[in-house]
């Protein structure tokens, strides 16, 4: 599955638009890692446990979006975007969305 942030596919034509596809996940850290991150916040520096959590959340959200596009018979997603939001202390939602299309050589 081709996943692009652009609205077009260079050298290809859009044969059919299948529609909006999306994938989401809500992730949280366990209390031990959350406490460790709180200490890191006091002294500065990267909060590795949160970086890992968001990386995993992006991968899951994109994977779910791709699954939805494949179920529609699409071979690409264009205009892909990621949105994250904080839901509660230590929890974050990640949403991936885009337009599922079928492309062909131009």
Swiss-Prot record:
Family of the protein in this entry: Belongs to the UPF0145 family.
Species annotation: Clostridium perfringens (strain ATCC 13124 / DSM 756 / JCM 1290 / NCIMB 6125 / NCTC 8237 / Type A)
Segment forming the signal sequence: none
Listed name of the protein: UPF0145 protein CPF_0876
InterPro entries noted in UniProt: UPF0145_dom_sf, UPF0145_YbjQ-like
Lineage: Bacteria, Bacillati, Bacillota, Clostridia, Eubacteriales
């Amino acid at each position: 599955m081709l996943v692009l942030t652009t609205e077009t596919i260079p050298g290809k034509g859009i044969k059919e638009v299948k529609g909006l596809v999306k994938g989401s996940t809500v992730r949280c850290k366990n209390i031990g890692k959350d406490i460790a991150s709180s200490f890191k916040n006091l002294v500065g520096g990267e909060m590795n446990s949160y970086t890992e959590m968001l990386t995993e959340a992006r991968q899951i959200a994109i994977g779910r979006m791709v699954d939805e596009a494949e179920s529609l018979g699409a071979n690409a997603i264009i205009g892909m975007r990621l949105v994250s939001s904080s839901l509660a202390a230590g929890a974050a939602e990640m949403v991936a969305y885009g337009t599922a299309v079928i492309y062909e050589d131009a």
